[in-house]
């Protein structure tokens, strides 16, 4: 159970700035209302509830993905869904704590 929680909330040790410079897309998986209240520049809003139905579209981007949300939990779930679909994904954690290392 603890390892599952660590996996969901873990903020992958990735240089996000480098990933973005190489074309990574930031997907904010919060609800549209949360997204409207504030979000990262250039982030795309695809709520967690829609991630599974949008996998093919995301795959067509042919780019790595960084997921973010309010706390890191939903972005961790989205990361797992996308990775299981063969999309290179990292969990960026909470959008308002997202750091470009």
Protein language model regions, located:
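Short hydrophobic beta-strand that contains or immediately precedes a catalytic carboxylate
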Residues: 26-29
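Rhodanese-like catalytic fold shared by cysteine-dependent sulfurtransferases
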Residues: 2-16, 22, 32-64, 73-101
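Short cysteine clusters
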Residues: 69
């Amino acid at each position: 159970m603890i390892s599952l929680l660590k996996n969901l909330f873990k903020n992958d040790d990735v240089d996000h700035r480098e990933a973005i410079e190489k074309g990574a897309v930031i997907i904010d998986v919060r609800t549209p209302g949360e997204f409207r209240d504030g979000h990262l520049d250039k982030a795309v809003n695809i709520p967690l509830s829609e991630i599974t139905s949008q996998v093919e579209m995301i795959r067509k981007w042919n780019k790595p993905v960084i997921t973010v949300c309010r706390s890191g939990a939903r972005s961790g779930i989205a990361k797992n869904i996308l990775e299981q679909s063969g999309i290179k994904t990292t969990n960026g954690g909470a959008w308002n704590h997202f750091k470009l290392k």
